[in-house]
């Protein structure tokens, strides 16, 4: 038996259409690129968030799809450290809302945004609410 595909980026559009029709949850990892001391890579938040989501979705591949991670978030307080990448909160919110609206437009009625960066938290909350209101 062929395993159920769940990596959104590796699926074909007919597979995505079928996944949405099946009522699967679209899991969206979101983090940022920032410093984590002298010993860890700057994409630590992204790696950890994605790994947690991957592990969870792998347990229920027929119930969820794993969307590619959103790598950039709101991190202006880390800009003193070379390598950090931040985007403005308005840009972050517009981008995330567009991602969520795209998923809804393709038939996903349940979206789980998994946040791997503390400073994204208030914006993720608002994005979740706006997705419900605007779709």
Stretches with model-predicted labels:
Residues 28-36, 68-70, 74-77:
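Short, conserved active-site loops that position catalytic residues or coordinate cofactors/metal ions
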Residues 5-11, 72-135:
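Active-site histidine-anchored catalytic micro-motif
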Residues 56-70:
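Active-site machinery of serine-nucleophile hydrolases
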Residues 1-37:
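Active-site and ligand/interface coordination hotspots across diverse enzymes
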Residues 24-26, 63-65, 112:
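Structural motif
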Residues 19-20, 38-40, 80, 106:
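Soluble secreted/lumenal catalytic domains
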Residues 45-57:
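Short catalytic helix/loop segments, enriched in acidic residues and glycine
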Residues 20, 57-60, 132:
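Structural signal for hydrophobic packing residues in well-ordered secondary-structure cores
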């Amino acid at each position: 038996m062929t395993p159920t595909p769940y990596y959104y980026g590796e699926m074909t559009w007919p597979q995505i259409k079928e996944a949405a029709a099946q009522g699967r949850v679209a899991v969206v990892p979101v983090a940022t690129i920032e410093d984590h001391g002298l010993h860890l890579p700057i994409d630590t938040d992204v790696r950890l968030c994605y790994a947690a989501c991957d592990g969870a979705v792998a347990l229920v591949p027929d119930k969820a799809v794993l969307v590619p991670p959103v790598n950039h978030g709101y991190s202006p307080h880390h800009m003193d450290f070379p390598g950090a990448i931040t985007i403005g909160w308005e840009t972050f919110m517009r981008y995330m809302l567009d991602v969520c609206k795209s998923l809804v437009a393709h038939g996903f009625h349940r979206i789980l945004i998994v946040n791997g960066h503390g400073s994204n938290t208030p914006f993720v909350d608002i994005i979740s609410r706006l997705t419900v209101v605007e779709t």
